[in-house]
């Protein structure tokens, strides 16, 4: 069973007007409400309700049109009120499901028990040197939706496929950027093992501090093996919450795992029940976007690009939006796809960034593609310019003019340089004439070097072969 928490992309917090911006100096985005000061009263943010209902609709849930909030009572330093406002008895969404696609081509349905709204807690910062912990309440009161699955997943592969499906749904809705490394998407994995053929579930543990899909997969395998080892050695699995250390690939016990009755839930007296009228629900439904499956079918028909390209582009709302916007400007869908899947993904990997971190405009990418297609610059220069576009979103046309990067297409100038290269490299010339085709690559490289990378490579190859 997986519990997925997602911070919403909303400017204000769930019960107050403080900023939800990531970062900032500790305790700089706080007020009496989100720090739990006596006498402060919460006011529900309407947009949180709309996003939660939208996620519920997208995951085939039944929307609870009269839902309410409850207090979850517990003490922890990052919880200033000593209770968390959440939903237990009447959550906003229930009884949904999503279909996940597995590597062997099969599809499996994962049931969703409920989706509820709640406020986030603060953050503890541990100082190992001074052996103290500091509390930052900048995250306290940030709106969350929690998606609780049924225990339908049987492997790490299924868990990752399920989480990825939810990530895409939430991103396409614009409800969250779902960055695990920043905590805007979090997954707690509840895991138990049982003997083959047994119907009864074993004792479950909950694993926290999972900040990437790969860490989740490693933690699942480690916890599965730990529980099997305990059972096979005659020991009992303890119901507890464990913290994952990805560097050590090991989890350790944090505290005993509580059940709902341990939190002494009761209705929050400061918040009235939420009524979602039929008209309001239909308005939310009418704003549902085109999701990945529908987008893939449209791309195949409208743009005619390969299925592989379509799968990569639609796996991120940011990439899909950038692809469509750039293609609308330059009408070169395959060229746009190549730049996004090639250079863009390469740089993202090098910088350890996500597609959602892209800041360059479709206009400047379209201009770069236009410069290459017109023969104004060659491919190698275009890649250098794209690095600047990625980092600074420069205008490539202006950059080419300012730095004199226009491609040399003058046959006379090219021929003169190539003749000098041939004269300076007799061994490579002889190798080529003796049947070593690769030798011409060296001569092309020397020509490009002599012309500072601005020579037209097609013309260089043609003239070289003619002269040789």
Question: What are these language model-derived features?
Answer:
Residues 1, 6-7, 11-290, 307, ...:
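Basic, nucleic-acid-interacting segments
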Residues 182-195, 300-322, 333-351, 363-365, ...:
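Core structural elements
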Residues 355-366, 370, 379-449:
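Strongly charged, low-complexity linkers/loops
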């Amino acid at each position: 069973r997986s519990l997925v928490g997602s911070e919403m992309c909303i400017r204000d917090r769930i019960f107050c007007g403080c900023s939800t911006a990531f970062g900032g100096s500790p305790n700089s985005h706080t007020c009496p409400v989100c720090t739990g000061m006596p006498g402060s009263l919460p006011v529900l943010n309407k947009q949180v309700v709309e996003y939660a209902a939208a996620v519920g609709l997208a995951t085939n849930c039944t929307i609870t049109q009269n839902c309410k909030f409850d207090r979850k009572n517990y003490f922890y330093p990052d919880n200033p009120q000593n209770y968390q406002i959440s939903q237990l008895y009447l959550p906003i969404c229930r009884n949904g499901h999503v279909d996940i696609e597995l590597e062997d081509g099969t599809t499996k349905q994962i049931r969703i028990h409920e989706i509820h709204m709640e406020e986030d807690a603060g953050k503890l910062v541990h100082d190992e040197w001074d052996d103290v912990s500091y509390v930052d309440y900048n995250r306290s009161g940030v709106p969350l939706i929690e998606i609780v699955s049924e225990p339908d997943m049987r492997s790490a592969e299924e868990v990752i496929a399920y989480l990825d499906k939810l990530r895409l749904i939430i991103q396409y809705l614009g409800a969250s950027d779902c960055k695990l490394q920043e905590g805007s998407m979090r997954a707690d994995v509840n895991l138990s093992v049982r003997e083959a053929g047994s119907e009864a579930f074993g004792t479950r543990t909950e694993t926290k501090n999972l900040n990437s899909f790969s860490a989740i997969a490693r933690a699942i395998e480690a916890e599965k093996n730990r529980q099997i080892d305990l059972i096979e050695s005659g020991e009992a699995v303890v119901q507890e919450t464990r913290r994952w250390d990805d560097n050590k690939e090991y989890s350790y016990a944090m505290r005993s795992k509580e059940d709902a009755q341990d939190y002494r839930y009761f209705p929050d007296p400061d918040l009235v029940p939420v009524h979602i009228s039929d008209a309001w629900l239909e308005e939310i439904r009418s704003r549902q976007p085109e999701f990945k499956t529908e987008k893939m079918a449209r791309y195949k028909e409208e743009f005619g690009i390969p299925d592989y390209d379509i799968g990569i582009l639609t796996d991120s709302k940011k990439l899909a939006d950038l692809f469509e916007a750039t293609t609308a400007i330059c009408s070169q869908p395959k060229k746009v796809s190549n730049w996004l899947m090639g250079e863009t993904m390469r740089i993202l990997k090098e910088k350890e960034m996500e597609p959602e971190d892209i800041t360059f405009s479709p206009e400047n990418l379209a201009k770069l593609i236009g410069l290459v297609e017109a023969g104004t610059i060659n491919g190698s220069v275009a890649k250098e310019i794209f690095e600047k576009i990625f980092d600074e979103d420069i205008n490539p046309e202006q950059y080419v003019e300012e730095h004199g990067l226009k491609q040399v297409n003058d046959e006379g100038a090219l021929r003169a340089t190539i003749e000098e290269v041939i004269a300076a490299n007799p061994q490579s010339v002889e190798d080529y004439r003796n049947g070593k085709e690769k030798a011409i690559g060296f001569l092309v490289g020397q020509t490009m070097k002599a012309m500072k990378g601005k020579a037209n490579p097609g013309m260089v190859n043609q003239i070289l072969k003619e002269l040789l």
